Amino acid sequence: MNEVNNSNALHRSAPLAKQRGAKHYREGGAMIRHRCFGRSISRKLAAAVMAVSLLAGQMLPVMAAEDTGNAASVKNNGASATEKEVTLRVCSWEEYIDEGGWDEDEALELDNGTTIFGENSMVEDFENWYYENYGVKVNVQYSCFGTNEDLYNMLTLGDVYDLVCPSEYMIMKLMSENKLEPLSDDFFDENNDKNYYINGVSPYIRDTFETHEINGETWSKYAAGFMFGITGILYNPEKMTADEAGTWTVLNNPKFSKQITIKDNVRDSYFAAVGALQRDKLMDTEFRAQDDYSEQLKDIMNDVSPETIAKSQDLLQDIKDNVYSFETDSGKADMITGKVVANYQWSGDAVYAMDQAEEDGVKLDFAVPEECTNLYFDGWVMLKNGIDGDADRKQAAEAFINFVSRPDNAVRNMYYIGYTSVIAGGDDDTVYSYLDYTYGAEDDEEDVVDYPLGYFFTGDNSDPDYVLRAPAEQVNRQLGAQYPSQDAIERSAVMEYFDEDATKDINQMWINIRCYNIKDVPIWAWFIVAAVIGALAGVIVYHKRSKKFYLGK
């Protein structure tokens, strides 16, 4: 079975819905809603539902038949049996889309006159919008996965979907395996006012997708972005300085022995190790001034040569001895409770942790390592075996991407899940208005800074229309994590998909680190091992000679 080795798993924890902001986070609390249940709970619920269904089926067959007819009637909304209907099978991360049901006081009244309110689920609103605009009923079957590897294994085991939302490296893997359906030419038509994605995607994100390739094909041919972020160090400023936190070398800083946590996956940990190993090179001003700096940075951070893997293994074994633990999701809670003083974290989860800690009276900050940072994203791709040449289904899939990319819907999803949309909005300033609503300084605040974000919204960081007036502290907190500065973005690199041989090598490295640290073996133990091996060899030789002597005799 062609399964992904879980030692290579990258699991960004499922985001939790929340509200925050310089203007509003001080009074806001975490609002946690669930779109999909965990697998074990889902299976138990499914079993219970099935049992009840079977019992009901035995006791009330006639009523069951009537209910089936009624359900069909409701589903079709009174439509005739001949009316066209498209089924769209979507699979995305758990808790990664607005489920609606907002309270009335949650309505977002933005300065540009837009009111954002999630009454219905995003999926339900899409179904209604699609019918109104295309005259075709669409039935969205929405499923969830917990990790990229879960999704890949689901596909390998035979699950079929039309549209999925994996992370960058899994998109690259699916591209390399020729499993993706290319986006249509119509999807990129900027004259179509329903093409919200191509008309609203951030110029920076668009350029990233159009300049990165797999096997000579750009990401943009197959993928449309959804959410993005960077990695860094979440830390307690009362226990650690910004300079101490702002480098990958903090992970093996003995001053913070057993007070830091690191990600329990090979890709994130390997990236941090390479960043620390290459610190001198990455910090060199001449290197950063080169015209092809970004390309060289990408090559360095994706170096999987035997030498780099070996050096990274040695460093990660040292880091393993220095950190409190490897973790996937517990790091946020450990920071909030004060169990640790720093945590290697994804920006989206860092924002969540800062929000939650603030409710408990704890202030946390976020530092982007000065050497470099990892740019990650999740994006929509269509699966070839799902679309299967069906033009209606492909149109519905692309329409779904466009609908969630509409600026007001991008805001709904950001508000609900807490991550950062790739949508800037183009001529529609709703996203920026939401940013100002969330992080803009109050008129009477004194300690404020100008925070330019033109690189994201227009491609020009000097654009005066996109300079946010924000509380100074937010530069190193939620604002800086959710919308990184241009300086942080310029020293970011995407960690690309590794081929089969490289994946095997770094997975073996990870096994060596997580399961066995050769440096922990004392010298005297090696002498014992050598003596035992020597003794066993002697016994084998003795028996062979004895057997030869006996046979000869």
Regions found by a protein language model. Give the residues of each.
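Bacterial N-terminal signal peptides
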Residues: A48-G57
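Ligand-binding "clamshell"
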Residues: L174-L183, E217-S220, A353-V368, D444
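Conserved C-terminal helix/tail region of periplasmic/extracytoplasmic solute-binding proteins
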Residues: T458-K553
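Sec-dependent signal peptide cleavage junction
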Residues: A56-K75, H543
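Early extracytoplasmic/lumenal segment of secretory-pathway proteins
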Residues: G69, V74-K173, E177
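Extracytoplasmic ligand-binding site segments that recognize negatively charged/polar headgroups
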Residues: R89-D105, N112-E119, Y169-K339
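Extracytoplasmic/periplasmic substrate-binding proteins
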Residues: D321-G389
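Mature extracytoplasmic/periplasmic domains
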Residues: M382-Y483, P522, I533-L536
